[in-house]
Amino acid sequence: MSLMTKLGFRALVASCLITAGSAANAQVNVLITGVGSTQFPIATANFTNEANLPQQITSIVRADLARSGKFTNIDAGSTPVPETASVDLGAWKAKGANAFVAGSVNRDANGQYKVNFILYDTVKQQSLGGLSLTATDTTLRTAGHKIADYIYQKLLGVRGVFATRLSYVIKTGNRYQLQISDSDGQNARIALSSTEPIISPAWSPSGTKVAYVSFERKKPIVYIHDLPTGRRYMVSDQKGNNSAPAWSPDSNTLAVALSLTGNTQIYTVNANGGGLRRLTQSSSIDTEPFYSPDGRWIYFTSDRGGAPQIYRMPAQGESAGAAQRVTFTGSYNTSPRVSPDGKLLAYISRTGGGFKLYVQDLQTGAANAITNTNRDESPSFAANGQYLLYATQSGGRNVLAAVPSDGSAPPQILSVQGGSVREPSWGPFMQ
């Protein structure tokens, strides 16, 4: 969420933070370009039998690799090449491709698609294996993303995030929509539509649920939405405000910020809505909890030192150990997010009258701004830790942007066809 001169928790200001857009349907297009100084050249031939499919597998694979900023697509021509073909790898190397992909799509008697592909290293003149996937008309895109993930991991040694999903809130006219999309912003589905603000979406570690805060009952209440079934249920409707849900790594618990006794404090609640337990015991404002990936710590924002800073405490609460301050660069830091490997902390820092996304090495304490935008908020790591998604402003609009988490390239604004978009959350690896 956005930031205030006096730190408060996010639910109170949601209605003034989310601005109106003009389009009835908004589409987010995710692009990350120019990552690093070297891009891997790869040629992906058209898969056989895909010309009349509702989704072109090779188009999805090529687009995924290109938007990652890590690959350059070499023209593979228009002739389909199946995975069973004998391939002249030397010829593809001569064309500038260090890797080559061939594949096929075949429909079986049940109407399902069998998608097969093989990846070659043209430099070492060897196969790097492949996958055999089953898909339907509605999951062909997912199959394409999984192929791109396989290629990314085999060639770069890091697990790809193309088959992950995003959640975000779009406001068009007077209506708010919590949308779930593929990692490229395509295939967006509406999880919730409301005339009242929706904020703070947070993915469960399994990727099957999203917790969020809705104002539909004229106050902030925490809900969980089960994506496979479409069922949703209330988790926290305590006296006062209920805000900032964050999942524990085992999915059993949510940390939340509640003003149950006055000042906002951090609590935990079971994912079924029971077992409320207070964790912080300060006279200050404690908010924006976030679990470390090993579940040992909860990072949070507090003004207990006189100005907002990031602290961490044992996941059992301050009764198990005193909270420790984590951020020391800058006088105003909020919105902590820990990378999936537990090594980096992303947060928002007020600098020069604006707000920038910073990344801090949790071992050394070194912190650096990684964006050139100036109204940053709501950072969210990709599941592989390689990228950060965040909300910012560009051209007077609320937009999303993506940036490498090491700051190796400038952020890229994500294209939205109308509307105001914010509150991004990047989902985990699919189980």
Curated annotation (Swiss-Prot):
Region forming the signal peptide: 1-26
Alphabetical UniProt keywords: Cell cycle, Cell division, Periplasm, Signal
Subcellular location: Periplasm
Cross-referenced Pfam families: PD40, TolB_N
Listed InterPro entries: 6-blade_b-propeller_TolB-like (IPR011042), PD40 (IPR011659), Tol-Pal_TolB (IPR014167), TolB_N (IPR007195)
Subunit organization: The Tol-Pal system is composed of five core proteins: the inner membrane proteins TolA, TolQ and TolR, the periplasmic protein TolB and the outer membrane protein Pal. They form a network linking the inner and outer membranes and the peptidoglycan layer.
Protein name as it appears in the record: Tol-Pal system protein TolB
Gene it is expressed from: tolB
